[in-house]
Amino acid sequence: MQQAIEQYATGGALRFNGIGKVFPGVKALSDISFEARPGSVHALMGENGAGKSTLLKILGGSYQPNSGTLQIGEQSYQFKSTAESIAAGVAVIHQELHLVPEMTVAENLLLGHMPNRFGLINRGAMYRRAGELLKGLADEIDPHTRLGDLSLGQRQLVEIAKAMSRNAHVIAFDEPTSSLSAREIDRLMAIIVRLRDEGRVILYVSHRMEEIFRVCDAVTVFKDGRFVKTFEQMADLDHDRLVTCMVGRDIQNIYNYRPRQHQGPSLRVTGLLGPGLHEPVTFAVQKGEVLGFFGLVGAGRTELFRLLSGLTRSSAGTLQLDGKPLTLKSPRDAIEAGILLCPEDRKKEGIVPLSSVAENINIGARPRHVNLGCLIQGRWERDNARSQIKSMNVKTPSPEQQIMFLSGGNQQKAILGRWLSMPMKVLLLDEPTRGIDVGAKSEIYEIIHNLAADGIAVIVVSSDLMEVMGISDRILVMSEGAITGELNRDEADESRLLQLALPRTRG
């Protein structure tokens, strides 16, 4: 053991020196500088969108920083590829594992550096080496087993063994327990302690407070892509102080909130169950109300929206719209009922990238007068696209411009324009301002408030605490597939919302 400690400790500390990363219209990281010591588990904490995953992608070579360098020991780096990161002794174990299900465990472990003899893969040596790597880590896993036949927890152990096969000095874990059982979590914690005790640098990203206090030696907090503080000693820290550090910032006056009168019941959900919901979900939203849903990654909010929009089928529960029973078997049922969804991943699910702005606005939209003929239909579509571009303030050179060349904010406004072309009663907005600059955010907030003033029930999923507090009349909090709290606008504060959203136990 002492030899292993000395082997990895000589790799030195991991230092981030002035790391900056800018995407079009968004500053993801700004001047990030801190140090993680060998022989320690260093947590990265912050809300969704704080910049943790972006930093890990830079560490792993998937992204290249616009400024700054990494330093491991005395050597400075700016990785231009994942191969360069691996060669420097870095392994990043992502939430979605980078393994090949159809290959055997041994093939996955040694992919890229398989033993060979006379130019052919030496399979005997490959399986022996794989067995050595799994020994003491996952003795029950047969190297000959097809990886797709393993549990998620076992696949994660294979990913860790793969990192060890490359003698990684720096190992980063990104939300590693999000889909693990309590027993698998216990096992993972023990392995992380073992890796730490060998002198490696361990970075650990998790929203689970109990894991942070259980296994970590230091914590660095991020907020809006900026470094906030590093706590070098866990003894200096408790749950409330960490939450306060994560959420502390001034509210910017960009939300355009104004009080409004609600106009009677709109959508009522009773005892709803389905994929991603682990307890029956019950709530109601009023006409003219903006109802916010807050939660962390994996809370079940997007899964709830998929049920409400007919993308997935419920296994239990009932829906009522305007006091009448509603059954959703498909997205068409939801659209015809007036329940419209702006999805979280607009590039994959919200737009057709190669089509024009006008074509994207008119997807599914039809004039209220039927049987008008092709010429009149075409004229209506042109007029409708121009009208929505103007009313939504979509910045585009032309309605015929391919939508892929617009900014994220203008793409989102075009999607909203599409739905305004149709009869609407309930609007579902899943992370409506993710990846959008502040100016476009303010415009989208204004659109939301105008829709509510017109009597539309607007339900907004957001991982941004300030946003959900700034635009909502009422806030529901979800955690691990269940509603864990409800707060009126004047009751909500960041600490209460985050405490309701943070999972504390796992059965």
UniProtKB/Swiss-Prot annotation:
Localization terms from the record: Cell inner membrane
TM segment ranges: none
Residues bound to ATP: G46, E47, N48, G49, A50, G51, K52, S53
Entries under InterPro entries matching the protein: AAA+_ATPase (IPR003593), ABC_carbohydrate_import_ATPase (IPR050107), ABC_transporter-like_ATP-bd (IPR003439), ABC_transporter-like_CS (IPR017871), P-loop_NTPase (IPR027417)
Catalysis performed (reactions): L-arabinose(out) + ATP + H2O = L-arabinose(in) + ADP + phosphate + H(+)
Broad class of where this protein is predominantly found: membrane
CDD domains: ABC_Carb_Monos_I, ABC_Carb_Monos_II
Coiled coil feature spans: none
GO cellular component: plasma membrane
Recorded topology in the membrane: Peripheral membrane protein
The keyword Nucleotide-binding is assigned to this record: yes
Cited Pfam families: ABC_tran
Stretches assigned to the ABC transporter domain: 14-249, 249-505
The protein's assembly and partners: The complex is composed of two ATP-binding proteins (AraG), two transmembrane proteins (AraH) and a solute-binding protein (AraF).
Family the entry assigns: Belongs to the ABC transporter superfamily. Arabinose importer (TC 3.A.1.2.2) family.
PANTHER family, per the entry: ARABINOSE IMPORT ATP-BINDING PROTEIN ARAG, CARBOHYDRATE TRANSPORT ATP-BINDING PROTEIN MG119-RELATED
Function: Part of the ABC transporter complex AraFGH involved in arabinose import. Responsible for energy coupling to the transport system.
NCBIfam families cross-referenced by the UniProt entry: PRK11288.1
UniProt protein name: Arabinose import ATP-binding protein AraG
Organism: Pseudomonas syringae pv. syringae (strain B728a)
Gene, per the UniProt record: araG
